[in-house]
């Protein structure tokens, strides 16, 4: 064997001279680079790979046809390689390459042996096909084919011929092995896990680089609607829990136990993220490097083709070689681009998992006060999305610079010193852009802060939508939100202008660099090299231009990442209980025994507490002991700090002095029920069980003890009833009962109840206390009796407490001890006039109720038995001891996606844009695209003229016009960007937000039964963010790229009819591809947006109930749930990104075919000049880049338009459900009398389109017939869930009556309220809701009180003084302008704030009427007589005089003022309607009576309808005629009582009359309250 046929093979070459037509490499070059170096590299990489796989478990069955085939072929290939090695030793001495031949065969044989071993381990212990084998076999296969051709052409003997035949056989073996190795092993796994269920988790490099693994998903999306639950899982490497575990290791200074440690040990968040995802971050580097090389090869291809056409002798082999080179280059570009983006997108979604999990975990570590100010929902949504958008072109930073350096060197070899022109311009633009980028971060932070405020405001409003509508604040809140939106858009102006500047700077190098370079070198550069120079400049400027455009998003992303880091650096709550010994202070009290040490639940020693470090003390000098297994009650006046003390024991409030010692039993779970019940948006049963183990008997026990059985039997879906966002679909009492039941169901050894009885009716309160806290109650009967703490205003139960703690108004402990001691020491407790336990216990605690109560309520013993039987029948216990609820399942949101026409979405988005602006935008884009593409054709004309015998124009002419075209293109690009950002984006964004939020504020409450808070928040967070940020950028990019693409296609068609003949085929192929793509991608876009709503809802739930969850040790369960929701949201988003790059791969393949067609055309037909070939290939070089950019921008645009589609669908859905918006607007003075009439009205919470059955559970109100006279004060009573709040909602137009309801069935002052616009109705009727709403953190006291901003400071101060709130505000730095912190207010103070807000509304209304009317209307202050003030003072002094002298509670007598009695009959005094929905549920009796006086004086002539559970106003303050009896004041505040039960009026009359009726239901309620002579 000598292969000595050609003497040129002995040289390095690389091109052989004088042999094989000159179209081949030398044999020496091939032996070195084809047969030696690649196998040697494989040997180096294979050894550590085998070592890493050796210890891994076997996960794939090796007894299969695939494994056998690979091993057999591997051994056959090894035998062949050994044979070739032996034959190589037979070479002649004259053959100078025999040594190189031998070394090549030794290395190749060794690599073949090692490949068999690698194949074994890769097959059995790796989920994917072997990447190292895929790359090695694929690369060496192409090299071996080329080498095999050379060997065949170099055969010089029979031995050479035999050698070549064996070598050909090894090539065939390697080809089959490459195919077998690339096959998936999915069906051969020993154990199937999430990786085997993923689409790409078991695929190899070939499948990944061609995206063939998406074929099943694409076909499925094309043929059928996609469902979220049908999407495949992500592979193990992208599991959230796995990623977060690694992320936590690198964020020790931010999260976990070391949170809050020394900041010097912290890594910047960007570094921590890079360290966590180091391998995913590095994987895209190799394909990106390959892409750089292939991209630069395009310039050499253009040079080779133009050189071939310029040559006189054109060899056919060279033409075929150019065609082959074109195939290799463009196939390589397509594959490397796909692999690069695949790995980079995986990194981005891994980063999203880490950041989202980190933000959620940090949220669980923060205090309630910190969470209220942080508004972290924006971080999880908007900021993370901007971080990912900024990191999208992360690898372009280094890749573009490397490519720029290489291309600059190539330009230097051709242009010498002139290469500095394009490079200098590029550097100058880069410096300018860096300067711009320095300012983007600051502007971006400002914008994000305003976005955060707006989203937090909307989230707060949506969480309290019922209260907003009841309070008539919908229009006011709408104005506030729209004002915040305008502020946000103004804040975005700086970022938008800088983005325009950055994008304009990015266009400068690409458009101006060719002009100045050709102007300087046109006389010295050969015309045939012009296209090569232009191509090289394009390779220099195009990636840098893309990089420049990425600077603004990158800086914005880094600014958002900095905001996230700031959030992660917040000080965590310092929990003083837990399993961490360093955080736990156990009780050590002298030499006491361990049993005695742990007989305490809590002990506070000289404790002082404050909400935040810089805030004043809310509790001070606290010394108390809460014993284990004892019942401790905490009482005190409104604002004394009862709730604060509960939070202090939980560790939620900062301890500034003293110690809090925690007993052993309180280290674990603590069941905490706050004043505002925390409920997640799930079923009632799920809220009660709440991650505890299911126990049927315990479940039934707690719902009976809590009184929930009565309500469950009357709800349509029973246990399976959805509670809605924040319990929207339930009454306040029902929400509280569920929270109580949850605490009872838990296995906690310590239970803390914060004012849980205040929102319950008298009978329910009595039932709850007797069955839960009483001597025979549930908590005292349990064998492991827990420590129970109850904060309450219901002081009648104090005699039954084991220990009593009394707080003073100054925030310290006034007294504490047992009842017997405190009731006789002359202190605060004795002044309450509560009767002793011997008088209370027989009737309250032992279940001896009054006969009138037992006989006249629907829930008798037999009813309760039937309720219990119904309850037990509803529950079906499955074999795994989990309960399921029979009956209709709650219908959740549908995950089937349908997409309406895309054009409709564009019309909806652009409807607010003027026609002039839209036409100008399109015209400027067309100008940009045409003048971008046409100069390349202009170069073709220049070359033709330059190569002709008689030139028509000088070079200056051609360069001048060439420069003019580029200048016009730059101007068109700038105008396109400016118009899109200003005239389109700002106008459309403002219009979309305004119309949709206004529609939601007008929507009926039934809408929020089907759409939860998280979903709606997602619309105004993620979707609006896409509309504001991503949509204008992607719209600009796509329209410009589309204009360029069409212009290039037109220019190419004009230059060659042959190329135009390919267009129909290319268009048909692209149409089919895009149609297949859109069917799937549009569904995935909607799913990706919708899948985030549950994640955001879960996040909002945790933020709202953080104290409850932290106390119950449930954060781990919620973290796991967050991980599940995060993974679900990742699936459609990740698959969408992959589908987008599948489309890019197909477009690159189409470009490849066009390039092959052009090269084939010019090399084979040879009737096209150099100009056509050069211009065509330059355009194709740019065309591929433009298509890639167009694909990305189109994908982003479609994603953004998916958000527009969702917003459009939401608007249409809301508008279709909204009623009453076409009604009338009555005169400003309406209602002037307050005459209310209801005639046979029934109503349901189901929308009017839903089927409603006429059953107890289906109707909220049943056949209500009611007439309320002007000026009448009506109290609505009844147990929780009886329909009291529903009646208020009906009067406000928020609850829809049945369609069968007749005309004029609901009238106020003679007008049917259904004919009045609902927004107007809520504004005209003043209402005070049970729960107070506040603006987000940062809003001042005055802004929260005077939402309209129409009152003076003196008016606001006057009202606050009347409500005894001014002293609280006066203590704040800044007074009314200081930031309000609602979490520092007690529930009673919050309710007083609501009353103050209503008083201000009434005064503003009176002022507006006076200004609009010529009638002089006396003001409230004029109607308030001096005698009333004196009488009020007398009442209070009388009360103080008898304190401590009577065994009855001292009640100030309410005497109505003369104005109140006469105002309703005066024509010059306008009345109205005031609705009070349990506004006094958290007030003590003295505070309640004081504010009834204020309401009476502030609202003269008003018809007042009040829902109340507080019946103390009806109890006489003198000696009762018999024990347990109650009477009403003859001249009291209320002159009419209505009792509701099951949605029906069961009693109606004057309080005195009803109390004197022996079987009165109202009398039964009052007797329940009278047994303690105190409010219930």
Swiss-Prot record:
Pfam families hit by this protein: ABC_membrane, ABC_tran, TMD0_ABC
Bilayer topology annotation: Multi-pass membrane protein
UniProt entry tagged with the keyword Transport: yes
Transmembrane segments: 27-47, 72-92, 99-119, 267-287, 289-309, 321-341, 387-407, 417-437, 500-520, 525-545, 915-935, 957-977, 981-1001, 1035-1054, 1060-1078, 1142-1162, 1171-1191
Gene3D superfamilies linked: ABC transporter type 1, transmembrane domain, P-loop containing nucleotide triphosphate hydrolases
Residues reported to bind ATP: 636-643, 1278-1285
Cited SUPFAM superfamilies: ABC transporter transmembrane region, P-loop containing nucleoside triphosphate hydrolases
InterPro entries per record: AAA+_ATPase, ABC1_TM_dom, ABC1_TM_sf, ABC_transporter-like_ATP-bd, ABC_transporter-like_CS, ABC_transporter_C-like, ABCC_6TM_D1, ABCC_6TM_D2
Domain ABC transporter, first and last residues per copy: 602-834, 1236-1567
Coiled coil: none
PROSITE patterns xrefs: ABC_TM1F (PS50929), ABC_TRANSPORTER_1 (PS00211), ABC_TRANSPORTER_2 (PS50893)
Main subcellular location: membrane
Keywords: ATP-binding, Cell membrane, Membrane, Nucleotide-binding, Transmembrane, Transmembrane helix, Transport
An MF annotation (GO) of this entry: ATP hydrolysis activity
Localization annotation: Cell membrane
Residue ranges annotated for the ABC transmembrane type-1 domain, each copy included: 289-556, 919-1199
GO annotation, cellular component aspect: plasma membrane
Top-level division of the source organism's lineage: Eukaryota
Its job: ABC transporter that may provide the dual role AAL-toxin export and self-protection by allowing the fungus to evade the harmful effect of its own AAL-toxin production.
Further information: Gene clusters encoding host-selective toxins (HSTs) are localized on conditionally dispensable chromosomes (CDCs), also called supernumerary chromosomes, where they are present in multiple copies. The CDCs are not essential for saprophytic growth but controls host-selective pathogenicity.
PANTHER family from the UniProt entry: ABC MULTIDRUG TRANSPORTER (EUROFUNG), ATP-BINDING CASSETTE SUB-FAMILY C
Similarity comment: family membership: Belongs to the ABC transporter superfamily. ABCC family. Conjugate transporter (TC 3.A.1.208) subfamily.
Protein name: ABC transporter ALT5
Biological classification of the source: Eukaryota, Fungi, Dikarya, Ascomycota, Pezizomycotina
């Amino acid at each position: 064997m000598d292969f000595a046929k050609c003497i040129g093979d002995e040289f390095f070459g690389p091109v052989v001279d004088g042999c094989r037509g000159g179209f081949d490499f030398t044999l020496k070059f091939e032996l070195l680079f084809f047969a030696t170096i690649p196998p040697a590299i494989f040997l180096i990489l294979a050894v550590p790979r085998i070592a890493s796989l050796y210890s891994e478990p076997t996960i794939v069955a090796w007894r299969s046809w695939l494994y056998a085939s690979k091993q057999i072929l591997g051994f056959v290939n090894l035998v062949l390689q050994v044979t070739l090695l032996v034959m190589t030793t037979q070479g002649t001495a004259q053959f100078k390459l025999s040594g190189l031949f031998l070394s090549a065969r030794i290395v190749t044989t060794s690599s073949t042996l090692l490949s068999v071993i690698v194949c074994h381990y890769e097959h059995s212990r790796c989920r994917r096909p072997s990447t190292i084998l895929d790359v090695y076999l694929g690369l060496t296969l192409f090299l071996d084919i080329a080498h095999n051709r050379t060997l065949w052409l170099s055969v010089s003997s029979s031995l050479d011929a035999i050698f070549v035949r064996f070598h050909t056989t090894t090539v065939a073996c390697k080809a089959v092995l490459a195919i077998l190795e690339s096959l998936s092993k999915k069906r051969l796994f020993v154990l199937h896990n999430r990786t085997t269920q993923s689409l790409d988790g078991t695929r190899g490099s070939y499948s990944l680089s061609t995206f063939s693994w998406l074929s099943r998903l694409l076909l499925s999306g094309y043929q059928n609607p996609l469902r979220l639950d049908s999407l495949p899982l992500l592979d193990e490497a992208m599991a959230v829990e796995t990623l977060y575990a690694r992320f936590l290791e690198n964020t020790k200074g931010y999260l976990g136990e070391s949170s809050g440690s020394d900041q010097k040990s912290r890594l910047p968040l960007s570094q921590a993220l890079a360290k966590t995802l180091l391998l995913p971050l590095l994987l895209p580097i190799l394909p990106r490097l390959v892409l750089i090389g292939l991209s630069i090869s395009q310039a050499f291809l253009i040079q080779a083709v133009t050189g071939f056409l310029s040559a006189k002798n054109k060899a056919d082999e060279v033409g075929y070689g150019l065609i082959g080179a074109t195939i290799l280059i463009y196939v390589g570009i397509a594959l490397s681009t796909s692999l690069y983006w695949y790995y980079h997108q995986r990194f981005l979604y891994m980063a999203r998992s880490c950041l989202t999990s980190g933000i959620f975990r940090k949220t669980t570590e923060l205090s309630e006060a910190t969470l209220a100010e942080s508004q972290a929902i924006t971080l999880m949504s908007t900021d993370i999305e901007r971080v990912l958008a900024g990191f999208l072109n992360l690898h372009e930073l280094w890749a573009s610079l490397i490519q720029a350096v290489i291309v600059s060197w190539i330009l230097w070899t051709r242009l010498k010193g002139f290469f500095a022109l394009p490079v200098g311009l590029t550097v100058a633009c880069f410096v300018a852009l860096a300067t711009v980028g320095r300012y983007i971060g600051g502007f971006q932070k400002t914008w994000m802060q305003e976005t955060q405020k707006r989203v937090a405001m909307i989230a707060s409003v949506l969480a309290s939508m019922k209260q907003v509508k009841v309070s008539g604040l919908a229009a006011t809140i709408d104005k506030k939100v729209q004002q915040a939106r305008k502020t946000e858009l103004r804040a975005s102006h700086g970022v938008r202008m800088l983005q325009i500047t950055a994008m304009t700077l990015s266009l400068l190098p690409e458009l101006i660099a060719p002009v100045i370079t050709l102007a300087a070198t046109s006389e010295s550069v050969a015309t045939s090299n012009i296209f090569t120079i232009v191509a090289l400049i394009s390779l220099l400027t195009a990636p840098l231009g893309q990089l420049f455009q990425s600077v603004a998003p990158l800086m914005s992303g880094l600014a958002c990442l900095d905001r996230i880091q700031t959030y992660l650096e917040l000080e965590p709550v310092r929990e003083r209980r837990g399993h961490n010994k360093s955080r736990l202070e156990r009780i050590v009290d002298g030499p006491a025994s361990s049993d005695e040490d742990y007989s305490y639940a809590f002990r506070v020693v000289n404790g002082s507490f404050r909400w935040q470090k810089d805030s004043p003390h809310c509790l001070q000098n606290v010394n108390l002991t809460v014993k284990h297994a004892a019942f401790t009650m905490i009482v005190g006046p409104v604002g004394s700090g009862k709730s604060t003390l509960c939070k202090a024991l939980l560790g939620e409030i900062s301890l500034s002095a003293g110690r809090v010692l925690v007993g052993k039993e309180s280290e674990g779970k603590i069941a905490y029920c706050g004043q505002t019940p925390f409920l997640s948006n799930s079923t009632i049963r799920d809220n009660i069980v709440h991650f505890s183990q299911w126990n049927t008997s315990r479940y039934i026990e707690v719902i009976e003890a809590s009184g929930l059985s009565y309500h469950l039997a009357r709800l349509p879906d029973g246990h399976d009833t959805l509670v809605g966002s924040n319990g929207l679909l339930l009454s306040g009492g029902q929400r509280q009962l569920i929270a109580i039941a949850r605490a009872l169901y838990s296995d906690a050894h310590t239970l803390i109840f914060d004012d849980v009885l205040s929102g319950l009716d008298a009978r329910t309160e009595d039932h709850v206390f007797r069955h839960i806290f009483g001597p025979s109650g549930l908590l005292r009967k349990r064998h492991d009796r827990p420590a129970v703490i109850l904060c309450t205003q219901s002081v009648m139960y104090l005699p039954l407490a084991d220990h009593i703690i009394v707080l003073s108004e100054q925030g310290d402990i006034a007294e504490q001890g047992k009842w017997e001691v405190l009731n006789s020491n002359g202190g605060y407790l004795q002044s309450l006039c509560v009767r002793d336990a011997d008088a209370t216990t027989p009737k309250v605690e032992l279940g001896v109720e009054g006969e009138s109560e037992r006989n006249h309520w629907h829930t008798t013993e037999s009813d309760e038995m039937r309720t219990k039987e119904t309850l037990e029948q509803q529950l079906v216990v499955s074999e795994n001891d989990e309960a399921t609820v029979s009956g209709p399942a709650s219908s959740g949101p549908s995950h089937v996606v349908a997409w309406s026409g895309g054009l409709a979405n564009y019309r909806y988005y652009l409807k607010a844009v003027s026609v002039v602006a839209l036409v100008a935008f399109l015209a400027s884009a067309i100008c940009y695209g045409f003048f971008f593409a046409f100069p390349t054709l202009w170069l073709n004309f220049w070359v033709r003229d330059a190569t002709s015998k008689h030139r028509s124009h000088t070079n200056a002419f051609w360069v001048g016009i060439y420069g003019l075209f580029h200048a016009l293109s730059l101007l068109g690009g700038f105008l396109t960007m400016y118009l899109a950002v200003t005239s389109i984006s700002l106008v459309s964004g403002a219009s979309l937000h305004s119309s949709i939020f206004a529609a939601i504020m007008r929507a009926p409450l039934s809408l929020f039964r089907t759409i939860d808070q998280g979903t709606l928040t997602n619309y105004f967070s993620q979707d609006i963010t896409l509309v504001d940020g991503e949509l204008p950028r992607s719209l600009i990019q796509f329209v410009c790229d589309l204009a360029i693409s069409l212009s290039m296609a037109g220019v190419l068609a004009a230059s060659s009819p042959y190329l135009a003949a390919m267009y129909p085929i290319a268009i048909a192929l692209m149409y089919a591809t895009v149609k297949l793509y859109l069917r799937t991608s549009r569904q995935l876009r909607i799913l990706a947006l919708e899948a985030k709503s549950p994640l955001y809802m879960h996040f909002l739930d945790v933020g709202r109930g953080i104290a409850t969850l932290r106390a119950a040790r449930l954060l781990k369960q919620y973290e796991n749930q967050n991980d599940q929701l995060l993974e679900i949201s990742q699936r459609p988003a990740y698959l969408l990104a992959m589908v987008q790059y599948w489309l890019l791969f197909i477009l690159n393949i189409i470009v490849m075919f066009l390039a092959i067609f052009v090269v084939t055309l010019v090399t084979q037909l040879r009737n096209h000049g150099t100009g056509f070939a050069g211009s065509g290939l330059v355009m194709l070089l740019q065309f591929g880049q433009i298509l890639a950019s167009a694909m990305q921008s189109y994908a982003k645009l479609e994603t953004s338009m998916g958000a527009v589609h969702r917003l459009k669908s939401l608007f249409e859905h809301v508008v279709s459900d909204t009623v009453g918006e076409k009604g009338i607007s009555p005169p400003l003075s309406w209602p002037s009398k307050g005459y209310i009439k209801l005639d046979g009205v029934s109503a349901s919470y189901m929308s009017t389109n839903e089927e409603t059955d006429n059953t107890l559970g289906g109707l909220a109100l049943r056949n209500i017939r009611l007439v309320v006279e002007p000026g009448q004060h009506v109290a609505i009573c009844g147990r929780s869930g009886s329909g009291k709040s529903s009646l208020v909602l009906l009067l406000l137009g928020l609850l829809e009556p049945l369609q069968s309801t007749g005309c004029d069935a609901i009238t106020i002052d003679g007008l049917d309220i259904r004919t009045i616009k609902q927004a107007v109705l809520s504004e005209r009727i003043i209402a005070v809701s049970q729960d107070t709403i506040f603006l987000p953190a940062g809003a001042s006291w005055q802004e929260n009180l005077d939402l309209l901003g129409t009152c003076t400071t003196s008016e606001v101060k006057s009202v606050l003084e009347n409500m005894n709130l001014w002293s609280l505000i006066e203590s704040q730095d800044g007074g009314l302008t200081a930031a309000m912190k609602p979490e520092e207010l007690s529930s009673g103070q919050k309710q007083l704030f609501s009353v103050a807000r209503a008083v201000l509304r009434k005064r503003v209304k009176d002022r507006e009427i006076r200004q609009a009317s010529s009638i002089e209307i006396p003001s409230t202050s004029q109607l308030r007589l001096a005698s009333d003030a004196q009488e009020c003072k007398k009442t209070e002094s009388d009360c103080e005089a008898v304190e401590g002298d009577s065994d009855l509670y001292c009640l100030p007598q309410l005497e109505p003022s003369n104005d109140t009695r006469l105002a309703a009959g005066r024509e010059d005094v306008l009345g109205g309607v005031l609705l009070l929905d349990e506004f006094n549920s958290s007030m003590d009796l003295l505070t309640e009576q004081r504010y009834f006086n204020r309401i009476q004086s502030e609202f003269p002539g008003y018809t007042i309808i009040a829902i109340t559970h507080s019946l103390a106003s009806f109890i006489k303050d003198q000696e009762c005629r018999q024990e347990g009896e109650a009477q009403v004041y003859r001249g009291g505040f209320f002159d009419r009582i209505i009792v509701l039960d099951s949605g029906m009026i069961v009693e109606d009359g004057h309080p005195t009359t009803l109390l004197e009726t022996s079987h009165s239901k109202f009398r039964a309620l009052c007797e329940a309250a009278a047994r303690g002579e105190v409010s219930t």
